[in-house]
Amino acid sequence: MQYISLNTTIITTTETTGYGAG
């Protein structure tokens, strides 16, 4: 996910939702 790199602050939150794993 490219937008993950842009949102460094929300990375922790995305990991919980499953986006961080991707």
Swiss-Prot record:
InterPro entries: Thr_lead_pept. It comes from the Bacteria. Belongs to the thr operon leader peptide family. The lineage of its organism: Bacteria, Pseudomonadati, Pseudomonadota, Gammaproteobacteria, Enterobacterales. This is thr operon leader peptide. This protein is involved in control of the biosynthesis of threonine. One of its GO terms (biological process) is threonine biosynthetic process. Keywords: Amino-acid biosynthesis, Leader peptide, Threonine biosynthesis. The gene is thrL.
